[in-house]
Amino acid sequence: MKYKSIGNVETKYYQIPEELVLESGKKISDVTLAYETYGTLNWDKSNAILVCHALTGDAHAAGWHEGDRKPGWWDIIIGPGKALDTRKYFIICSNVIGGCKGSTGPSSINPDTGESYGLDFPVVTIKDMVNAQKKLIDYLGISKLLAVIGGSMGGLQVLQWSVSYPDMVKKAIPIATAGYSTPQQIAFNEVGRIAIVSDPNWNSGNYYGEKEPTHGLALARMIGHITYLSDDSMHQKFGRRLQDKNEYEFDFSREFEVESYLHYQGLTFTERFDANSYLYLTKAIDYFDLTENNSLAEGLKNVEAKFLVISFTSDWLYPPYQLREIVMALSANNADVTYREIESNYGHDSFLLESGQLNYVLNNFLSHTYVSDIMIEDIATIKEGISIDEAARVMFEKEITHLPLVSSDSKLVGLVTSWDISKSIALKSDNLEEIMTKNVVTARPDEPIEKAAEKMESKDISALPVIDKDRRVIGMVTSEDISRLIEEF
């Protein structure tokens, strides 16, 4: 099936009003974030999904810019009818700080000097990127994200979001990524950086307005691009075919198709990316490590999100064992986690190319709504011993029709409704326990919303207190919430 694109889009810009304090302790002012949004934010701002880009990505994740020859880098996933359906969700994607596609980075103008930062730009980390994104999300007035999703370096950001802001992320989807950078990953990044700094035109990062280190950056891209492919995909794409010739030349010219391909990838990359940004972003990847006391489980102990962790069989840059390690760490903390290992020959680039399988897996996870996704968390309750008059006053002031009665340790004892209050007046009763419901029908936060709806329909009730495993009241879900969900999605 062919799906529509979202059409033409524009990049927006947000300037953080205060200084951004970095993990290194340094501060940077006048930070700008380039971002794009797709879809419509609903009235209670509960349908927002943050998409985090990979090393060489940007804010342009979907749709078309005027004059573009191709759409945004994840157009296969974002748009009407796709997993990130813009008819349902409000999608946000921003360029990371340290980047070169509109957000503040080493190629930006340093307000103190009036010239490009170059290496005066402070080193940033994945945590710094996420903290900057948090400023943007606050600016958009969003208190909780329905999901945060990203592949590769984007997956690192997803994991950092779940650790730094656990109460802001309902669903986390890290793809083709890791809980920490391995020595092999760091080694590949270092070779790329050496290629750049060895270019005479790099000039210690002060090349803006001069000849740029295109040779070094192209070589770094060629090295990196090899790690994004797989042996199978290279066999299928190139084999041992020669480029525009039938016999060996017995010299050192480019003879094989794969050689021409890599040179083309390197050359075109230099036209859209900044060499210093490549240094900064790969360094941020190297520093990424969520373990505490050499334990990833310890580092992920405070996460609250539901997780979908996705790997690809042929990915040797972020191999499946690293994604399974994330799953095991989450499971050790009793986190709600689903793991999917997708069969693919595309290597690490699978997350950008596997449209069919990835859309299917993502759609199944995102469209499965649980009670915790729509329940009202900050609800009023009353304690045992309260009078009917006091209960009625709470209902009136809070403009609610259902009021859970709880014990001193917040465990559910009963439920008082506005109907019960009316009944007490008719019966001239002043004993709350006589008129309240004692055998309360409840919901659990991890229940599918369909099950909660069935309970309401079968019992002819309009609200369910949500309780945890110890019967403590943690929220309320109403028929109105469910009806609104159906209307929106």
Swiss-Prot record:
UniProt key word Transmembrane: no
All residue ranges annotated as the AB hydrolase-1 domain in the record: 47-354
Entry-linked Pfam families: Abhydrolase_1, CBS
Disulfide bridge positions per record: none
GO cellular component: cytoplasm
Active-site feature positions: S152, D315, H348
Biological processes per GO annotation: homoserine metabolic process; methionine biosynthetic process
Protein name from the UniProt record: Homoserine O-acetyltransferase
High-level lineage: Archaea, Methanobacteriati, Methanobacteriota, Stenosarchaea group, Methanomicrobia
